[in-house]
């Protein structure tokens, strides 16, 4: 029984729910790990200038590729609801439409990105050797942008298709490809930043193109198949609105990172910026657990909402909040234990920087206790098709509250205010999330089953 295939229509116990979301959590963790390896290879084999250039230009393809996240989360919710309503053919048509829409729109953005790459890099502060590295790395990533968007989309749709394990193994394949090619192209063959970019491109072909062949095959055993489709303008618009929280999150991250770096340069100079970089790399691993759970459980919520199974919605809602609470405590405690070791791996060569990073990470890590509830809340409302509420939580959490905290807390607390800003933002966002959970129940009936 324990090995029986789990379906979206099932009743979910704690065990069944965890088994269903674990592949998605693993996918997010593995993606974070091979991203870290990518950065370490450039830093150690090419140098700090190349590493700085990669980090400088990386937000641009991340921003342009956000359409994949947006249509992946927003589209999978619509497809999941449609499956719950029992319309398999329409679900396949919507699935195909979302993939084609992402492919076309991101391809256009990739061309524009290549054309305007140099002026954007200069605007971000690149010049001289830094600009040269940024251009060489950025051009290749712009070419790979469509595959990057598809890879992001499939992370959500594999779960909706009841194939989270297959999605995990595609990610493992892409990650291993990236790491092996990084070592070969950057470390052994000496191809520099171009080698790192090519390794990323090839890995995205594994994660973004190979799944297309799987879903084209009509004999595959998943819930979804690619097929001939039509242009459903309203459905596409709804998917964009529904997934707008993902767009907001990625846009906000870039703006917030700029302000973080500005404040840290004021209070701690280059060491402050370096410490923040280490914290971001390490935080990816902890955030991945919360995001993995939220993304992995969202299609279940969409399906049962589409099926009007409010009893199961209540079951999923209550169990998820309890699990998030346990995970939050474990993640916060674990981060406190591993902080010295993680900091030493990145900056063990500098005692002053090591001490600053270790202290800053301990203060920053307090936000892990709150973050999970906000991440889940935003994803939960996306799964219910309420993109406006989801986007509101994301906007307040990742942009407005963080910007306000980063501006005002350092005025009172100095650099400690910078490290505490994210926790203050999560606390403010949690108040909004709880309020939305209470008020929106009148519409979606996930806390109380209607008579």
Report residues per predicted region.
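Transmembrane helical elements of multi-pass membrane transporters/channels
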Residues: 19-38, 140, 174, 203-207, ...
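Small-residue-rich hydrophobic transmembrane alpha-helices
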Residues: 51-111, 148-167, 275-339, 371-393
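Short alpha-helical transmembrane segments in multi-pass integral membrane proteins
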Residues: 1-21, 79-146, 188-243, 301-367, ...
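Transmembrane alpha-helix boundary and packing residues in multipass membrane permease domains
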Residues: 24, 28, 40, 44, ...
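N-terminal transmembrane alpha-helices
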Residues: 8-46, 59-74, 78, 103-110, ...
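Interfacial/gating helices of multi-pass transporter permease domains
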Residues: 42-62, 129-133, 193-194, 235-242, ...
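Short runs within selected transmembrane alpha-helices of multi-pass transporters and secretion channels
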Residues: 72, 140-159, 167-178, 196-211, ...
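Helix-terminus/linker motif at the lipid-water interface of multi-pass membrane proteins
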Residues: 33-52, 121-128, 184-191, 251-281, ...
């Amino acid at each position: 029984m324990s090995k029986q295939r789990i379906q979206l229509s099932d009743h979910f116990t704690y065990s069944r729910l965890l088994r269903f979301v674990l592949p998605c959590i693993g996918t997010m963790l593995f993606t974070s790990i091979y991203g870290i390896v990518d950065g370490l290879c450039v830093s150690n084999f090419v140098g700090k200038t190349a590493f700085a250039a990669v980090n400088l230009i990386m937000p641009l393809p991340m921003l342009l590729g956000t359409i994949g996240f947006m249509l992946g989360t927003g589209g999978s919710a619509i497809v999941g609801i449609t499956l719950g309503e029992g319309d398999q053919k329409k679900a396949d048509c919507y699935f195909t439409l979302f993939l084609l829409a992402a492919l076309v729109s991101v391809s256009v953005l990739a061309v524009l990105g290549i054309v305007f790459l140099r002026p954007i890099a200069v605007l971000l502060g690149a010049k001289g050797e830094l600009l040269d590295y940024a251009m060489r790395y950025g051009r290749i990533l712009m070419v790979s942008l469509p595959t990057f968007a598809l890879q992001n989309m499939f992370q959500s749709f594999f779960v909706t298709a009841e194939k989270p394990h297959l999605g995990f193994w595609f990610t493992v394949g892409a990650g291993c490809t990236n790491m092996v090619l990084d070592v070969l192209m950057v470390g052994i063959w000496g191809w520099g930043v171009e080698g790192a970019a090519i390794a990323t491109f090839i890995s995205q072909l594994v994660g973004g193109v190979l799944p297309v062949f799987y879903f084209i095959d009509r004999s595959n055993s998943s819930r979804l198949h690619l097929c001939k489709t039509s242009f459903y303008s309203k459905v596409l618009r709804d998917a964009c609105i529904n997934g707008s929280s993902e767009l907001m999150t990625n846009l906000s991250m870039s703006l917030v990172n700029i302000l973080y770096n500005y404040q840290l340069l004021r209070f701690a100079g280059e060491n402050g910026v370096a410490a923040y970089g280490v914290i971001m790399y390490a935080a990816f691993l902890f955030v991945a657990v919360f995001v993995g759970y939220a993304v992995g459980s969202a299609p279940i919520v969409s399906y049962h909402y589409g099926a009007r199974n409010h009893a199961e919605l209540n079951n999923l809602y209550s169990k998820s909040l309890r699990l998030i609470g346990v995970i939050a405590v474990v993640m916060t405690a674990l981060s406190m234990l591993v902080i010295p070791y993680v900091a030493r791996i990145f900056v063990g060569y500098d005692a002053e920087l090591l001490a600053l990073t270790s202290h800053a990470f301990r203060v920053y890590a307090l936000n892990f206790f709150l973050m999970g509830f906000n991440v889940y809340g935003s994803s939960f409302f996306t799964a219910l098709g309420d993109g406006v509420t989801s986007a509101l939580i994301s906007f307040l959490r990742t942009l407005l509250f963080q910007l306000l905290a980063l501006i005002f807390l350092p005025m009172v607390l100095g650099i400690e205010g910078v490290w505490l800003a994210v926790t203050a933002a999560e606390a403010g966002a949690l108040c909004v999330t709880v309020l939305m959970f209470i008020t929106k129940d009148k519409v979606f009936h996930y806390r109380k089953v209607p008579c």
